[in-house]
């Protein structure tokens, strides 16, 4: 607690008292309830933590860390968005939702024109991280989605294990479709991933999409993939490369905190960016820490 207080004091000293408060928005956090008869997970799926990560657990963490808002990304345990939307309904100034959709069913296209009429819904998050879902990118299963989402004016966050280059064609063909790369293009935000993934190559692939103005990127893979303690210096070179390619208005601070609790406190996840990355100016931090994702998702 003493260290956290010292960090908070350090952050306050960075900005003049006359400056407006920086809005801090975490662009990715998973919420889920306990497994029960009315909240059943799909077979073969499991949560990132043994216990639920709930609204009531998140709010005090946010307050302690100085996080103003969170983009809830429902976990890939099923295609349900109801608990995330409940959070947004109860706390509309704190939570918004990037909802999941049954991508394998073309009939889901009928949901998109009114998708954002659901209170708190900001867009869609799609995942291609298993052999069956990865196949959707090449066998035509997902083809219906990109023009439908573009027509509906929806922002789309995507996780595509090893297949980020495929999105160059999607970004070019659908220039009005807002695309947001998860985890800096890395396979996950877990340090176990470091054993198998060529991180420099994955970063190269993500940077290659920076030429498309409709593409932006989340930093959610940074801390979880670090093999060092705070302030995670081994990831700084990758953060700077991504930032230099995309610029402050297309880079989004995100924690995926439930995937990396053991790595750092929530407050450290904030100060990592606000205090430890010398290549970021104060204006850059304003964009990266919240202003950019609010603009990208049109979240007022």
Language-model regions, residue ranges each:
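Mid-to-C-terminal alpha-helical segments outside catalytic/metal-binding sites
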Residues: 1-12, 22-27, 43, 47-69, ...
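Conserved, mostly hydrophobic/aromatic
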Residues: 28, 62, 84, 149, ...
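Short, acidic/polar
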Residues: 52-60, 106-115, 202
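Active-site gating/metal-coordination segments in enzymes
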Residues: 68-69, 78-162, 169, 218-222
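Catalytic pocket-lining loop regions of alpha/beta-barrel enzymes
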Residues: 122, 135-252
């Amino acid at each position: 607690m003493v260290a956290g207080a010292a960090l908070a004091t350090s952050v306050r000293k960075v900005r003049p008292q006359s400056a407006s408060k920086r809005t801090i928005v975490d662009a990715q956090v998973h919420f889920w309830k306990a497994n029960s008869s009315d909240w059943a997970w799909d077979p073969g799926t499991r949560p990132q933590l043994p216990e639920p990560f709930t609204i009531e657990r998140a709010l005090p963490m946010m307050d302690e860390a100085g996080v103003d808002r969170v983009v809830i990304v429902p976990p890939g345990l099923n295609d349900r968005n109801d608990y995330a939307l409940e959070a947004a309904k109860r706390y509309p100034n704190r939570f918004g939702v990037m909802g999941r959709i049954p991508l394998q069913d073309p009939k889901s296209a009928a949901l998109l024109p009114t998708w954002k009429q659901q209170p708190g819904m900001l867009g869609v998050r799609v995942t291609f991280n298993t052999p069956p879902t990865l196949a959707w990118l090449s066998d035509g299963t997902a083809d219906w989605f990109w023009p439908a989402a573009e027509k509906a004016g929806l922002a789309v966050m995507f996780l595509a294990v090893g297949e980020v280059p495929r999105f160059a064609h999607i970004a070019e063909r659908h220039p009005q479709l807002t695309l947001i790369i998860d985890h800096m293009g890395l396979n996950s935000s877990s340090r176990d991933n470091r054993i198998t993934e060529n991180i420099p190559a994955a970063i190269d692939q993500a940077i290659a999409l920076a030429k498309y103005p409709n593409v932006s990127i989340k930093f959610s893979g940074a801390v979880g993939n670090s093999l060092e303690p705070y302030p995670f210096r081994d990831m700084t070179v990758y953060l700077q490369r991504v930032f230099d390619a995309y610029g402050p208005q297309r880079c989004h601070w995100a924690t995926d905190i439930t995937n990396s609790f053991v790595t750092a406190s929530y407050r450290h996840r904030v100060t990592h960016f606000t205090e430890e990355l010398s290549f970021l100016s104060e204006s850059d931090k304003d964009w990266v820490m919240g202003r950019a994702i609010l603009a990208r998702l049109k979240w007022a």
